[in-house]
Amino acid sequence: MSDSDSSGGWGDVERHLRMYVIRHEKRPVDDPTFDVSLTAEGLQDAEEAVLDELNELGVNAVYSSPYRRVLQTVQPYLEQDHVGMGACVEWCLSEHPEPNDTPPTEIPDEFYEEFHIEETYTPFMTAEKAHRLNGDIEQVQSRLCDFVELLSRTHDDGDVVLLATHQTSVHALLSMASGIPIDCMDVPMGKVVELDWHGVLKYKYHGGPNPPWACYESHFIPNKRKGGGDLKWTYIEAGG
């Protein structure tokens, strides 16, 4: 069924809950710590390509890692008058592996002045618990599964939810949903990808898909154009 009716509007067509993930825009390659800012190019792309795509998708809920660079990525979208909301800062979307000598435990006061943040939002996971569940990729997958399940229960049909986070979390979510190994993925910075959240829940309760192919890094071919583009995968059959 088409998402829209023949008149170009949504009509009476039912719109299901959709979730998207975005990896933050470009940062300095040698500094993944909490307070590092996007590069000049990353800031510009956040104000142009990312902004345009989020407007096109009609995102109406944003959950963000507390890291400065992630909030910078979604800020141009959130500061628009028609959006009318802030980012829900969520510690379970934090960076992995831990890049800070001392893991952060609270949002700096200046972030509330610099970014549109929902001050009344209570995070699904405290900073302390997120840090405890940051030792390996299995812990990251577990905390992300639990969060996606919560979102699937608290959001309504028609909602368009964005999870703004980091490379490892983006790859972990897409891997759980698709069965494609994390090592085969290289989602570009600033890229928005739709998440099959049903697939994530199936992974949590029944284990992930078991695709009948061998996969190498070269199989994952991102295509990031100014207007977004598609993510494309190529596969080699097992034994081929």
Question: Predicted regions span which residues?
Answer:
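Short, active-site-adjacent cap segments at secondary-structure transitions
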Residues: 28, 69-71, 95-97, 169-171
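Glycine-rich phosphate-binding loop signature in dinucleotide/nucleotide-binding domains
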Residues: 55-58, 151-160
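Alpha-helical packing segments of well-folded alpha/beta enzyme cores
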Residues: 45-50, 70-73, 136, 140-151
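Active-site-proximal alpha-helix that buttresses catalytic centers in soluble enzyme cores
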Residues: 10-85, 190
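Beta-strand elements within well-structured catalytic alpha/beta cores of enzymes
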Residues: 17-22, 63, 158-169
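Phosphate-handling substructures
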Residues: 36-37, 79-145, 186, 204-206, ...
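Active-site catalytic microenvironments for nucleophilic, acid-base chemistry
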Residues: 76, 80, 150, 154, ...
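Acidic, low-complexity terminal tails and accessory targeting/binding regions
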Residues: 2-18, 83, 95-113, 157-159, ...
